A protein has these predicted regions:
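An exposed, glycine/acidic-rich loop-and-rim segment of catalytic or binding clefts
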Residues: 14-50, 56-231
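Sec-dependent signal peptide recognition
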Residues: 1-4
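C-terminal motif of bacterial Sec signal peptides marking the signal peptidase cleavage site
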Residues: 9-12
Length: 231
C-alpha cells in the first residue's frame, strides 16, 4: 500500500502544469466544441519573443504581445479569456474575421447580374458584417503552419446569409519578425458574388485594461477612401 501511495505522490509531483501565454491566456480555456466542431487557441511566436494568439472560433485575433518603446511586452488588442465568452458575445466582434461583406449594405439589398439579393437585417434595417451569422461567428478549420503562422479555411456555401456562390476561403495569420501581424486573405468562388473581407480587432496601444484611446493619433497611408452616407 505504501508503494502505491509513493507512486501517486511521485506522479502528482511530476505532473506538468499548464503554462499561460505571455498575455496570461490558458490554451485549455479555448478547447471546446462549438457547432459540432472543435475549437482551440493557436499561439504564434517570432524570433524576438513577441506573441499573437488566434482562436478558430470566428477566426479571432485574441491577443498581440509586442514590446513598447521601453521594451516592455504589452497586449495591444482587446479579447476575451476563454471560448465561452466569445460564444456568449458573438457580435462584440473582438478580433473577428468579417465577411462575406464587411461594413453595411444599405437595406440589406444588392443587385448583381440583374438579380436582387435580400440579406438579413441586423443593424437598424441594414446588413452589417455579413449578418448576425457572419464569418466572425463560425468555426474555421485550422492548421498551424509553423511557429509564426496559422492557416484558417472555411467554405461559405451558396445562399449562406443570402449571398450567392460557394466561397472557399483561406486566411493566414503570420507574426512577422518585425513584430507585425500579417493577415492574408484568399477567396475563390464558383459564381459572381460580392466579397469584402476584413479583421475587426480593437487596438489599445497603451496596453492598460479599461483605459481609453483618446490620446492615440492615427495615420492611414491611403491614396483613396470611400465616403459614407447617413446610413
Amino acid at each position: 500500500c505504501m508503494a502505491v501511495m509513493a507512486m501517486c505522490v511521485l506522479l502528482s509531483c511530476t505532473e506538468k502544469k499548464e503554462e499561460a501565454t505571455l498575455s496570461g491566456l490558458m490554451k485549455s480555456n479555448f478547447v471546446s466544441e462549438v457547432q459540432g466542431k472543435p475549437t482551440a487557441l493557436y499561439v504564434l511566436k517570432n524570433q524576438n519573443g513577441a506573441e499573437a494568439c488566434v482562436t478558430n472560433w470566428g477566426g479571432r485575433l485574441v491577443s498581440v504581445m509586442v514590446p513598447d518603446k521601453d521594451g516592455k511586452m504589452t497586449d495591444v488588442v482587446l479579447g476575451y479569456d476563454n471560448i465561452q465568452q466569445y460564444v456568449d458575445n458573438p457580435n462584440n466582434n473582438y478580433g473577428g474575421l468579417i465577411g462575406r461583406y464587411g461594413n453595411r449594405i444599405a437595406n440589406g439589398k444588392f443587385s448583381l447580374d440583374g438579380v436582387e439579393y435580400q440579406l438579413p437585417l441586423n443593424n437598424n434595417g441594414h446588413c452589417l458584417h455579413g449578418g448576425p451569422e457572419g464569418y466572425h461567428t463560425v468555426v474555421w478549420d485550422a492548421k498551424q503552419v509553423n511557429d509564426q503562422s496559422v492557416e484558417l479555411t472555411y467554405l461559405s456555401k451558396d445562399g449562406e446569409a443570402g449571398f450567392p456562390g460557394n466561397l472557399n476561403l483561406k486566411v493566414t495569420y503570420t507574426l512577422t519578425n518585425d513584430n507585425a501581424v500579417d493577415i492574408k486573405y484568399e477567396a475563390t468562388t464558383d459564381k459572381p458574388t460580392v466579397v469584402n473581407l476584413t479583421n475587426h480587432s480593437y487596438f489599445n496601444l497603451s496596453g492598460v485594461p479599461g483605459s481609453q484611446i483618446l490620446d492615440h493619433t492615427l495615420m492611414i497611408a491611403a491614396d483613396t477612401y470611400v465616403p459614407v452616407d447617413a446610413t
